[in-house]
Each structure stands twice: as C-alpha cells, then as structure tokens.
C-alpha cells in the first residue's frame, strides 16, 4: 500500500534529503571539482554537430547533458566501434569516463539538486524582478517623455511671450536690447512733451494750495512738484547733477552708450541667440563679479573745495535717464494724480452741502476756470505718462541706458527661458532612447527567462525520474519553491 504513495520532497530541502537518505555523500563537492576539470578539457574536442552546439549553448553542463552527448557520439563515432562493442574514439572514452565519475556515489544527483535549488530560489526570481523593473522603466520613460514635452512647450511659450513683450526678435538678444535702448532719447522727448502738456495741471495745483492757504502759501512751504516744474521749463536740458546739488555743472561727461552699441555690432562672434549646443552651466567668471546695482558717480566736491564742477556717470544723465531722478518724477506724477482725482471727486459730489458751499464761495480765476472736463483730461494724461514709464520693456531699457552692463543680466534671464525649451527637448529625446533600450532589455530577458524556465522544468522531471528509479518506480513530486518559481510562466 505504501509503495503506491508518492514521495513528496520540498525543493529547498532536496539536497539535504538526498544526503540524509544516504543517496549522496556530504563531501560530494570534492568529486565535482575533478569532474568539472574533465568536462573543461573534453568539450574542446567535439564533433561538428548542430545538436551538440544547441545542447551546449549557454548551458551549465550537468550529468544529463553528458548522457545526451554520449548518445550523439554513438552516431558520430560509430566508425570507431570494434566488434566487441567498445569505441576507440578518445572523445567517446572521455565522456564515458565523465559519466562514470558522475554516477559514483550519485554525485550527479547532488549536483543536479544544487543546480535546481539555485535556479528556483535565486536565478529565476531575480530575472523576473529585473524584467518587472525594466517594465517600470519603460512606463516611467513614457510618462517623463510626455511631461518633458509639455515643459518644452511651456518654455517656448514663456520665451516667445517675453520677447514679444519686450519687442525683440529673439535672435541676437544683446544687440537687439542695446538697439532698443539706443532709441530711448526719442521716447524721453515724447515723455518730456507730455509732461509739459500737464504744466497747467501743476499750476492749478499751486493755485489751489494758495487758495486754501487764504491767498498765498507760507514762505517756508515746499515747492509744488519741483521736478515736473523743472522739466516743464527746461525739458531735457537738466542734468541729475544740477537737480541734486542745485548747481549747473561746468562740464558734462555722459557714458558713451553709442560706443557700447558699436562694439556689440562689431562682435559678430558673440551670438547669444544661435548655436546648436545648449550651455546649462554657470555664466562666465568675469560676469559673476559685476555688481549691476553699483553706480559709480564722479562728481565735483560739494564740501566747498574750489574746482571745476564735473557731472559724470549717472549724474551726467538727464532727469528721465537717471533711475533715481525718474523715480522722483513718478512720485510727483502720482501725487498730482491723487490731487486731481480728489478735486474731481469734490467737483462731482452732489450733496446739498456741497452745492451750497460751491455757490457761496468765491474762487480765484486760476481755480474757478478749471472744469470737470478739464480735470478728467488731466487725469487721463497723467495716467498715460505713468503707464508709459512703468512699461516692463521700458523699465529694462531704462536700466540698460543708465547702466549698460545691466544688459548682460537681462540677456542671461532671457537665455534661461529660451534654453528651457531646448533642455526639455533633449531630455525628451533621452527618454525615447531609454524607452527603446528598456524595451529591448525586456524582450531579451523574457527570452532568457523562458529558456531558463524550460530547462529548469526538464531538470525537475529528470531528478524526479532518477529518484523514482531508486524507489522501484514510485512517483516522486518536487514541490514548494520550484513550483512557485515555474508558476509565473
């Protein structure tokens, strides 16, 4: 009855089971060393047979391979067989000797058990894990390819939006910026003309203050909008030096902006807009030490020393060119706008008290002559001047005109936006390459896995058959880890 029961052996305990049942010796590995050395030499002298090539390709040669090789040699070496049934071929003798060494003390079973355990516990799971990891790499590469495409498009739109806002072509950024800055004098003339147009609004402000001060402002009162008044009287013929020190300079030495522009035009090799290579590095060391906020002013000594009054650097610029003076101009425009808006609100308020007050009070001509329509016109004109002075493109150009080195900072910022598109496109290309590489690796590993799984199944059946022979043909089942390892295929 017990002879009909199958023998179930856990694959991870197979080698221990064979040793404990005295089928194999504990020191079986000592015999394997000599066998492997014999196989190493025998394999160098093999007949040209497709079957042998297929059998040996990428496989670890074990006892069962040796048996198959001997069967093939029986056909290829049949001419060397004598009448007693023995072979004179050295090839056959070598492999028959190897077979005998394997059978002694069942070394072949111990080695086969060890190979099966290694395949089931390590090689097959590791290969499956590697395939899973590469599958995830393909998925990640596809996702990143899509993300980088969107980021490249966003970078392109940002750059196009920026150069459109600054009215640039985007080819030779430095040259284009300097050319736009070179056109600023015409813009300053236009703003000066518009400020002169609102001189009447300033006069109205002065007249209204005098009226509210019962006829005249105190002698120590601060002048009304002095810079706007100065521009209204003399236009651009006022340097920052004169505004600061209330003294007209004897000599004016303006920064040579035209020379800088000429140098940019002559430097054809400096192309900030073209080139196939993208530089993701840090700017040149010389650029890194430039302090764009630093202003070098060479002015006459205002401590009382006798000498020629020279306006140079920033002080040589007129009031709209100099950043400090322009800021003061904008503050005065905002002050004027606030006053005009307040007066418009007063004039348009229709409460009973306001109507009675306006009917009873006697205003001077300079105040009474200003109508609601005139106030609205002035407000529109002041708002227009402020809008032009605060235009983002003009703000950059003002800084370039006042400090030409600032152009490098603007160019660097624009280049970062432009290079963003190229950078993400290159990353996109890299992800495409990664996808292809990972897919090829997955395909190759799947083929390898299929081959290993098939050879492991064969080895499992061969071991089961050999153990079965030792137990009078009882069925033998190798179970546990081996079935888990093979179950995925």
UniProtKB/Swiss-Prot annotation:
Positions in coiled-coil regions: none
Swiss-Prot/TrEMBL GO biological process terms: IRE1-mediated unfolded protein response; regulation of cyclin-dependent protein serine/threonine kinase activity; regulation of mitotic cell cycle
Name by which UniProt lists this protein: CDK5RAP3 protein homolog
The UniProt record lists the keyword Electron transport: no
Classification via Pfam families: CDK5RAP3
Statement: the UniProt record of this protein carries the keyword Ubl conjugation: no
PANTHER family cross-referenced by the UniProt entry: CDK5 REGULATORY SUBUNIT-ASSOCIATED PROTEIN 3
Function of the protein: Substrate adapter of E3 ligase complexes mediating ufmylation, the covalent attachment of the ubiquitin-like modifier UFM1 to substrate proteins, and which is involved in various processes, such as ribosome recycling and reticulophagy (also called ER-phagy).
Keywords: Ubl conjugation pathway
Range of residues in the leader sequence: none
Recorded GO CC terms: endomembrane system
Organism: Caenorhabditis elegans
Family: Belongs to the CDK5RAP3 family.
Database matches in InterPro entries: CDK5RAP3
């Amino acid at each position: 009855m017990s002879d009909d029961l199958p023998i179930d052996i856990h694959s991870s305990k197979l080698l221990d089971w064979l040793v404990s049942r005295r089928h194999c010796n504990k020191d079986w590995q000592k015999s394997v060393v000599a066998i492997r050395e014999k196989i190493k030499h025998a394999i160098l002298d093999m007949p040209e047979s497709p079957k042998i090539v297929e059998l040996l390709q990428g496989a670890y040669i074990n006892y069962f391979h040796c048996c198959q090789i001997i069967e093939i040699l029986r056909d290829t070496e049949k001419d060397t067989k004598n009448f007693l049934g023995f072979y004179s071929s050295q090839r056959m003798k070598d492999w028959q000797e190897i077979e005998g060494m394997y059978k002694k003390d069942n070394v072949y079973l111990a080695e086969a058990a060890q190979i099966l355990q290694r395949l089931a516990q390590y090689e097959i799971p590791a290969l499956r894990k590697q395939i899973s990891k590469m599958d995830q790499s393909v998925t990640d590469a596809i996702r990143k390819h899509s993300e980088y495409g969107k980021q490249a498009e966003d970078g392109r739109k940002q750059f196009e939006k920026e150069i459109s806002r600054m009215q640039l072509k985007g080819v030779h950024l430095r040259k284009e910026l300097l050319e736009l800055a070179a056109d600023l004098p015409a813009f300053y003339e236009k703003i000066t003309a518009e400020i002169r147009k609102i001189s009447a609004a300033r006069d109205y402000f002065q007249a209204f203050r005098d009226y509210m001060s019962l006829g005249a402002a105190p002698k120590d009162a601060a002048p009304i909008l002095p810079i706007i008044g100065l521009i209204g009287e003399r236009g651009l013929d006022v340097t920052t030096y004169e505004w600061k020190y209330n003294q007209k300079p004897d000599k004016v030495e303006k920064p040579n902006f035209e020379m800088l522009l000429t140098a940019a035009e002559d430097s054809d090799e400096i192309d900030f807009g073209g080139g196939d290579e993208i530089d993701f590095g840090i700017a040149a060391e010389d650029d890194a030490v430039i302090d764009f906020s630093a202003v070098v002013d060479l002015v006459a000594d205002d401590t009382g020393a006798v000498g020629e009054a020279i306006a140079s650097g920033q002080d040589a610029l007129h009031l709209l060119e100099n950043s400090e003076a322009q800021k003061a101009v904008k503050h005065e425009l905002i002050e004027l706008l606030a006053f005009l808006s307040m007066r418009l609100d007063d004039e348009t308020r229709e409460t009973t008290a306001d109507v009675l007050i306006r009917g009873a009070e006697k205003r001077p001509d300079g105040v009474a002559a200003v109508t609601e329509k005139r106030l609205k016109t002035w407000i529109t004109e002041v708002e227009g001047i402020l809008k032009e002075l605060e235009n983002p493109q003009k703000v950059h150009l003002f800084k370039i005109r006042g400090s030409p080195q600032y152009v490098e900072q603007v160019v660097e910022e624009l280049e970062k936006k432009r290079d963003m598109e190229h950078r993400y496109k290159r990353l996109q290309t890299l992800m495409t390459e990664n996808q292809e590489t990972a897919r090829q690796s997955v395909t190759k590993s799947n083929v390898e896995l299929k081959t290993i799984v098939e050879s492991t199944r064969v080895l499992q059946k061969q071991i089961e058959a050999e153990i079965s022979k030792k137990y009078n043909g009882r069925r033998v089942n190798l179970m546990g880890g081996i079935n888990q390892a093979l179950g995925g295929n």
